[in-house]
Amino acid sequence: PNPAFFPPMPPPFRLWDISAPVHADSPVFPGDTAYSQQWCATIGPGCPVNVSAITLSPHVGSHADAPLHYDADGASIGHVPLEAFIGPCRVVHAIGCGPLITWEHIAHAVDDDALPARVLVRTYDRMPVDRWDGQLTAYAPETIERLADRGVVLVGIDTASIDPADSKTLASHQVIRRRGLRVLENLVLDEVPPGDYELIALPLKLTTADASPVRAVLRAWA
């Protein structure tokens, strides 16, 4: 064949899988539904396939919250537009910053005119993928307000919630609701250097659910 008919291959890119593993020991918010799996059929005489049934909270592992999670009249995750979950993003390190991510913890990395519309913050040195962390780091609501002011449409974090684990008001979630942002939680950013990437973290089309698992990846810009 004529080589002119074939466009040049793009340069190779690195892919970071930033999804938490999901299994029976995956940590969940106290009282939430852990992952479990039962086999409905197994390969053997007269059965050519393995088929399982799984039960889990949609907040197990890396996930996207729907407005329905923090707003009684909010949209389910299956009705949330997908645009926010794919596109340019910035990974910011605020490791060991304390209970709340304040603007001072991230200003060095987000205070520029080229800030992408998606910001993911790493707070752990190593994310605890096999235990619940009741002292997790959350976003200060004022930080989300200022990110929204700068055009950010999605915020992410490597902890289980953008609010403190014992919060009864979910102040940061309420900023998300009021400003129309999207949120990703339980991301694994342990191996990801700070910088700009392409985020792909699409939720399932669960038409009545308050959240959805995502297979979140980052792709390095060529």
Where are these regions (language model features)?
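Active-/binding-site microenvironments in catalytic and ligand-binding cores
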Residues: 2-222
